[in-house]
Every structure is written in C-alpha cells, then in structure tokens.
Regions:
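The canonical Cys-X-X-Cys-His
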Residues: 49-57, 111, 147-157, 214
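Axial heme c-ligation environment in periplasmic c-type cytochrome domains
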Residues: 62-70, 85-126, 161-166, 185-222
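N-terminal secretory signal peptides that target proteins for export/translocation
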Residues: 1-19
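Extracellular/lumenal glycan-associated surfaces
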Residues: 73-75, 82, 169-172, 178
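The feature marks the first
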Residues: 43-89, 93
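Electrostatic cytochrome c docking/interface patches
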Residues: 35-48, 58-67, 117-144, 165
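Protein kinase-like catalytic domain
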Residues: 55, 87, 138, 154, ...
Length: 222
C-alpha cells in the first residue's frame, strides 16, 4: 500500500473514531492484557503503533477537525497521570477511557518513556502575528486579571516538569480547545481532586482572544 493511501486510511479512521466516541468500546482484539513487572518489548511496540495511528508516527499530533495532541517530548509523569485520570474519570474523553483502562502500570510507564524521547518539529499552522501577544502573557501573565505567568509553572521554555505538562510545540487548535472547555473535561471526579484545579481560575480568566494568543506562542516552541 502506498504512503498516500496509508495516510488517507489513518485519517479516515480518526474521523470514524471521533464520530463514535462514547458509543462503543474498543474491540477486544486491540486491548492489551494486564502485564506484571516490566512490559514486554513486543507488547510495547504493538501498543505504540496503535497510539501513533492517531497521535502521529512521531507523536506530533493530528491537526485536523478533531485535533489530537502532540505527545512527543511530553513529561512522563504527566502522561502517566493523565492516562490514570481517564480511567478514574477525572478527565473525560470516551475514546481515551477505552484505551487507558486496558493498560497496566508497566505499559503506561513504557509508553510515557517512549513519547518523552521523541522530538519532531512543531506542527505549525498558528497565526504568527498573535505569538508576540501570547509570549507576553506566557512570560508576564495578566496582572489586572489575576492571571499568573504561564512560565511560572510550565517553565521559561514551556517544557513542563513532573505532572505539569510540556506545552512547547503543542497543537494550536488543541490548546485552544482544552482551555475553552477546561471545566467540562478536567477535574470531573470530585472524590479525587488533582492538579487540574490549579488551571481552572486561569482558564476562566482568559478570554478567547488571549487563549488564542497563548496557543499561537507555545505552538511555535521546540
């Protein structure tokens, strides 16, 4: 099969998955059996291949109608925490719940470690004139709106740390979508509060234009 048709089939698959999110569970044939100890290399390779069908062969993300995040270079602890958040319904996404609840802790650790080592170029596509405004917000915050500098937590280069995510190179439309819909997707299990609560007042205090500016800036970083 040519590379063109392979890419086309993957794109069609992403759209189909997005349309049926929450309606059906993933087929048992693609689930991963619970592993004890270290995840086997062949199991990890198979699951990585499946993940990359949606997140991209270099984990660069998918910049389409249904934006799928960049995982390349992401903090390992953040990836592990978020996969568990899908399982515990602290973060809502029916597609990712169906993926995450099949994974053992060893498999999650192996996947997170692999994604951390990848470093493809940023996807691009953001309106560059907005990046200058976004940089000011990222570095200085918005004192009048009680918004702290993004860099205070995410680091001066937006690389994150521990359970604080890397934003550098993240897809422009994905960042916008997450901030606009923050309270509908994060911190949903009140019995298990998590670090997403820190971002709630920030997401509330930024208007759509400011969110777009920050997204434009971080999407260009390496």
């Amino acid at each position: 099969m040519s590379a063109f048709w392979s890419d086309a089939l993957r794109a069609r698959r992403r759209i189909e998955i997005a349309k049926v999110a929450g309606a059906v569970a993933l087929p048992a044939a693609i689930s991963v059996a619970t592993l004890s100890g270290l995840a086997r290399a062949d199991d990890v390779a198979a699951k990585l291949s499946y993940c990359k069908d949606c997140h991209g062969q270099s984990a660069q993300g998918y910049n389409g109608y249904f934006p799928i995040p960049r995982l390349a270079g992401q903090q390992t602890e953040y990836v592990k925490n978020q996969l568990q958040a899908f399982v515990e319904r602290r973060r809502t996404n029916n597609i990712m719940f169906n993926v995450a609840h099949t994974l053992s802790p060893a498999m999650i650790a192996a996947l997170a470690d692999d994604f951390r080592r990848l470093n493809p170029p940023p996807f691009g596509g953001a309106p560059h004139p907005r990046a200058a405004e976004g940089r000011r917000i990222f570095e200085d915050g918005i004192p009048d709106a009680n918004v702290a500098a993004c860099a205070a937590c995410h680091g001066p280069q937006a690389t994150g740390s521990g359970q604080i995510p890397r934003l550098a190179g993240q897809l422009y439309p994905y960042v916008i979508n997450k901030l606009v819909n923050w309270d509908r997707e994060r911190g949903q299990n009140r019995a298990k509060p998590d670090t997403s609560a820190v971002m709630s007042p920030v997401a509330h205090s930024l208007n759509k234009s400011q969110i777009e500016a920050v997204a434009a800036f971080v999407s260009t970083l390496r």
